[in-house]
Amino acid sequence: MAYFEVKGIAKFFGGLAAVNDVSFQVEQGEIYGLIGPNRSGKTTIFNCINAYFPLTKGEIYFEGKKISGLKTHQICKRGVGRTFQVVKPLKRMTVLDNVIASAFLHTRIKSEAVDLAEKTIEFCELTQYKDKLAKSLPIASRKRLEITRALATKPKLLLLDETAAGLNPSELDEAIALIKKMRDSGITIIIVEHIMKVIMTISNRILAINHGMVIAEGSPTEVAGNHEVITAYLGEDYSAQS
């Protein structure tokens, strides 16, 4: 059985199918990309995985055990963490206290939570901001704090949602380096990203979706050259010319 598996999931809001019959598998140690136009269902898939949205149908498995039907905190305890597209740190708390708060999802012992937070901050290269208020951080550091908070829950599988949005070219390179560093530390990653430089550089495989349905899966090169993917992003006219 795959390390992580989504089997025929669907999420309906009334009569609208935000996600419909989506299936994929992720192997341990992989960076697996999710791409698609705006409102194609990518973040909804993340919300279904983490039980922010209950599934309309389908099942989700992690390490051979069914996690669909569990509550969000239970899924986190199993080792599935995530970041959010819109970062919302605890603005009136320091970076360290933000990360400690997340570490308490992994341990209830304060000394262990503090130690875990400090090590995670060092891993993510935020030590210089440790004692600063979260609201004072520049956007790139806020994005990195979001990742740091997620890592403090000690995930084995991490869902990254638009981590690179709003970053300049040098910050993008730093974000890519951090994602690879997380992968090299043993964390399996599923990433939603619009910036093709990021997704094509780091992903082992990519799943493309449109209107909540799978349109392609394969290597970055295979997906980038797929007719349906080109049409979804650039339109029929461009696809016909290519």
Predicted regions and their residues:
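Glycine-rich phosphate-binding loops of nucleotide-dependent enzymes
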Residues: A2-E5, I9-S242
